[in-house]
Structures are given as C-alpha cells and as structure tokens.
C-alpha cells in the first residue's frame, strides 16, 4: 500500500512539475516600464511589446509599421549583373503603404493624425467610407463637440443635434455643407456636359479637396500631394443625400459618378506595386478593410499588415477577421508580417504614429536641417 501511495504521489508530482522546454533566447521576457527611471514617452511606448496582452500586440504593430517605413528594395537579394545605377535606384524603392479607416475616426480627433500623414506624404493610398470624406470637409466649416454616450436620442433630435458615440454634431453643420458642396456639383455637372469629364469617386474627392483649400483637411493634403483617396460607397452618407437633392433639382441627365474606373485604379495600385512591397494599416473594419485587402489579393497578398479594431471573428464578419484569415484568401502574403490590435483606434493609432511615422519625420527633418 505504501509503495502504491508513493507511486501515486510521484506521478502527481511529475504531472504538476512537468519539465519545461526552454524559452531562453526565443521569446521576449515580460516586463513593463519602470517609472523610477523618469518619464520617457518613447521608452514607455517601446516597452509595450514586452508588457503583454494587447500592449504587446500594439508593440508588435509599431515594429511592423517601422519595418514598412524602413524597407527598401536594396534590402532584398540583388540580381546578378546589377549595375551601380540599378543598385542606387533600388535604394529609392520604398514600401507602398495603404491606410484605411472608418468614418467615425474622421469624426474623432484621429482626423488630425491622418491629416499629418497626408501632409507629409507618409502614406500612398487612402480608403475610407463616405462619412470619412464628408466629415473632413464639414469640420472645415463647423465644429464637432464632445458629449456623452448616454445622451437621450429623442432629446437630441428635438434640439437638432446628432450623436456619434460621445460626439455631438449640430445638424446646422450639414446645412453649411450643402451650401458649400452644391455649387461645386453644379460646376462638375457643367464640366461633365461640356468637356465630357468622367467623374469617379476618387476624382470627385480630389476636386473637393482642392475646393476646400484648408490645411486642416486631410483631403486637401491628399489632393495637394497626389495621394489617391478611394471611397466605393460614396453615396452612403450626406454626400449621397446631396447628390440626390442635386440630381432631382436638375432636369435631364444628372451628375454621373463611375465607380468601375475606381476599382480598376485601386486594384492597379496593388497590381503594379511590384517591385515594391506593400503594407496595409487598417483602422476599424467594414468596407475600407475589405477593399484594401481585396486589392492586395491581386498581388498574392500584402507583405506587412496592421489591423486595429474591436470587432470579433465569431460571427464570421470580415471586420472581426484576424490577419490569418486574410492569409487564407491571399490578401496577406503567407510570408508576410501581420498583427491585429484589439483596441479602440482612437487610443492605439496616435500612439502607434508617435513611435513610427512621427519619429521618422523628426529624424528626417534633423538630417535635412529643417
């Protein structure tokens, strides 16, 4: 009996104290920022990767984004018989970066972060929903205000106030928007009829960016820096309302916006990216996420991918899908580097930019003496 009891205890001990495989040198050790060392925001952000949970995912997103920014064709194997001139040219070939975001982020203060990226040509292609277009212009005309998530809808409606989460948009803002955009539509219609101008969503957005002529607008900077902005859902929002009112007010064929030309242009951004690598950063889900991923499927997947959203995968939605699902479709390369950060993008994205794009911009400014 004693022997049997000893065997049972030994078995229990071996189960409880199972020998571990060594992780030394293969995994980062978990540890957070030590505030005894003073306040250093850059070191704090760098410490995210070893903090654990979504902080580590955010840290990984910073690393992958910096890899997008640092990659040059010259880093890849140089072909035989490559001339010095070709080698020099390879150094100038950078990763093409696609940035997608949902409209609520332009309603929020993330608009200013995106404006910074467009102003300094840090991204190459932008994709958003209609609200992400109109809210940018509307903010040039009138303000959005901080409210509360709990404000009663019926009470707000009686006051002509619209709620976006805990943001408040006075309905008067849309009246100002109509006063601004309808004369532009009038001129666009004239050009369509007299010059056979073929309007696409991206061409229309560029025209509106030109017309707003306001440096607080990310679409102004996209127009100025020739960054294409794609919005296949251009009629799904206030712009759609304005197109409706404009069309019913004008006899005969109204303004025509061709979305087919834009899907060709969008897919070509990915198809003809080679020999560049492509990187995708997607804030939120829905249309911008799928549109960017689908275009990159045309080249057998993006090389770098960062998703930031709070959507879950359990309902089979594309919004909630993890990067590995995109790999199965060829939307992210099977050899690509990808991460999903489960976080509100209004928190995560400015922090990511602070430790990636903004750092690169600051270093470049010092080198160039600006």
UniProtKB/Swiss-Prot annotation:
CC per GO annotation: cytoplasm
Keyword Endoplasmic reticulum part of the UniProt annotation: no
Pathway annotation: Alkaloid biosynthesis; pyrrolizidine alkaloid biosynthesis
One of the record's GO molecular function terms: deoxyhypusine synthase activity
PANTHER family for this protein: DEOXYHYPUSINE SYNTHASE
Role of this protein: Catalyzes the transfer of an aminobutyl unit from spermidine onto putrescine. The resulting polyamine homospermidine is a precursor in the biosynthesis of pyrrolizidine alkaloids.
NCBIfam families for this protein: dhys (TIGR00321)
Record-given protein name: Homospermidine synthase 2
Taxon lineage: Eukaryota, Viridiplantae, Streptophyta, Embryophyta, Tracheophyta
